[in-house]
A protein has these predicted regions:
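Conserved beta-loop-beta element that borders a ligand/cofactor-binding pocket
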Residues: 1-12
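Glycine-rich Rossmann NAD(P)(H)-binding loop
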Residues: 11, 33-38, 66-73, 84-87, ...
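Substrate-positioning beta->alpha
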Residues: 14-20, 34-56, 63-67
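Alpha-helical membrane-targeting segments
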Residues: 20-42, 92-135
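Generic structural signal for alpha-helix termini and adjacent loop/cap motifs
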Residues: 28, 58-59, 86, 145, ...
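Residue-level signal for the nucleotide or nucleotide-sugar donor/cofactor binding architecture
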Residues: 40-46, 74, 137, 152
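Mid/C-terminal beta-alpha module of Rossmann-like enzyme folds, strongest
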Residues: 54, 58-122, 139, 159-162
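Amphipathic terminal alpha-helices
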Residues: 137, 141-144, 149, 153-171
Length: 171
C-alpha cells in the first residue's frame, strides 16, 4: 500500500468550495478570516493526480506515504485576491475575526437546517476552519523519492478552475 496525502484540493470539477468562493468574491461578500496572513496548503487536483500516478508506478513507493502540495507559499489573503484578479473583481479587503466567522458559520448552517434549505450556506464551519488555520506540509519526500514536481502553478490552477466553473454555470 502507498499513501498519497493531498492537502486542500482545488481545480476543475470542484462543485463545492471554489464556486462559492468565486461568487462571494464577485459579489463582494467574501471576508478574510483573521489577518489573512496564514499559509494555505493548496494543491491543484491535476498536480495531485500526477503525484499519485508516480507513486503507484514507482517500485520503492510501496509502504510509503507522501504529502503532495503546490510549490510556493500562498496566504489566505493572496488566494482570495488571486481569485479576485482572475475574475476582474475588486480585491478582498474586509476582515472578520476567526471566532466571529465560526459563530456566523454555525448560525448559517443552523438556519439552513431549520428551514430545510437545499443549497449549502455561504460559509460553513469547515470552510472557516480551512481558511483560518495555519498549515504547511512538506512534499520534499515526494520530490526526492518520486521525482515529483507540481506542474501547474497557483495562478494557472486558479485560472483553469475559474474557467471550468464559468463553462459549467457555477460562477
Amino acid at each position: 500500500i502507498t499513501v498519497c496525502r493531498p492537502s486542500w484540493l482545488y481545480g476543475p470539477r470542484d462543485r463545492a468550495s471554489l464556486p462559492r468562493l468565486i461568487n462571494a468574491v464577485q459579489n463582494r461578500k467574501a471576508k478574510i478570516i483573521g489577518r489573512g496572513d496564514n499559509r494555505l496548503n493548496l494543491t491543484y487536483a491535476g498536480n495531485e493526480a500526477e503525484g499519485c500516478i508516480l507513486a503507484a508506478e514507482h517500485p520503492d513507493a510501496v509502504g510509503q506515504a507522501y504529502n503532495l502540495s503546490n510549490d510556493g507559499i500562498i496566504t489566505q489573503a493572496e488566494y482570495f485576491n488571486k481569485i479576485a484578479e482572475a475574475i476582474g473583481a475588486k480585491p478582498v479587503t474586509r476582515r472578520v475575526p476567526y471566532p466571529v466567522a465560526q459563530r456566523a458559520a454555525f448560525l448559517m448552517e443552523l438556519t439552513g437546517h431549520m428551514f430545510g434549505r437545499k443549497k449549502p450556506p455561504l460559509v460553513t464551519r469547515y470552510a472557516v476552519w480551512l481558511m483560518g488555520r495555519k498549515c504547511f506540509f512538506s512534499c520534499e519526500k515526494a520530490r526526492q523519492q518520486l521525482n515529483w514536481q507540481p506542474t501547474v502553478s497557483y495562478d494557472e490552477g486558479i485560472r483553469r478552475s475559474i474557467a471550468w466553473c464559468r463553462e459549467n454555470g457555477l460562477a
